Amino acid sequence: QVTTILEGVIKRGTGKKLRDLQLNLAGKTGTTNENTDAWFIGFTSNLVIGVYVGMDNPKPLGKFETGSKAALPIFREFIEKSVKKSDARPFKVPEKMTLMVVDPSTGEKAKFNSKNTIIEAYKSKNVLNGKVLYSDNNRIDTNNILKFY
């Protein structure tokens, strides 16, 4: 579940500048208060890379020096030189997990002709006939897919 969330950072979030690499990537950007540090942690199915940008004596890096602007380009340069597309295997889906194409605005299984979809991982016990269920009280939740994480 965490991997699919972090894949979303690359597909739709602050790591989207990596999408065009066409690799199976997941990651997270970070920026501290007052932009004194910026970082990006990213991974493939067999490699983890962390990039930190900051100073020994904390000083602001600059107003717009965020994880996606300062650290992500360094990650990109490294991953372009070290990972071949043929080496980038898909992430394995853990046992007892189900991948489902959902509409992110409703959390429900996407209809066949839906244009706005994402793939999310759910505990298999929380999926019944294509519907995602609360694990606590076994009722259908259509409002917040994040309740399953």
Identify the function of each model-found stretch.
Residues 10:
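Flexible, gly/ser-rich surface segments that form the specificity/activation loops bordering the active-site cleft
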